């Protein structure tokens, strides 16, 4: 992969990570409201948070991998 393609891929991955993190934050705020109101978290909220947490971890790993590739070049 060329340097420009790697930089573009990293930027795209970082953008996706940022939007995923924002969406996760929104679901976490919803969960906090549910906990405050009922002392439980709805299944939909819990499922969304788990899915987004996994996606964020995968995107973070991809960013690190791309950064390693770029530093090795």
Q: For each predicted feature, which ranges?
A:
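Intrinsically disordered, low-complexity terminal tails
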Residues: 1-73
């Amino acid at each position: 992969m060329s340097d420009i393609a790697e930089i573009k891929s990293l930027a795209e991955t970082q953008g996706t990570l940022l939007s995923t993190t924002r969406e996760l934050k929104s679901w976490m705020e919803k969960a906090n409201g549910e906990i405050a109101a009922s002392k439980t978290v709805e299944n939909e909220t819990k499922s969304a948070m788990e899915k987004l947490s996994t996606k964020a971890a995968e995107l973070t790993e991809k960013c690190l991998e791309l950064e390693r590739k770029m530093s090795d070049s």
